[in-house]
Amino acid sequence: GECCTDCAQTAAANYC
């Protein structure tokens, strides 16, 4: 999957 720019700040970092 793609990694977002603010992944480090969001829970989404788990799937990025």
From Swiss-Prot:
Q: Keyword check for Ion transport, yes or no.
A: no
Where, subcellularly, is it found? Answer: Secreted
Q: State a single Gene Ontology molecular function.
A: toxin activity
Subcellular location, principal: secreted
Instruction: Please provide, in alphabetical order, the Gene Ontology terms of the cellular component aspect for this entry.
Output: extracellular region
* UniProt keyword Phosphoprotein present: no
Give expression by tissue.
Expressed by the venom duct.
What about PTM?
A: Contains 2 disulfide bonds.
Q: What is known of its domains?
A: The cysteine framework is I (CC-C-C). Alpha2/8 pattern.
Q: What is this protein called?
A: Augerpeptide hhe1a
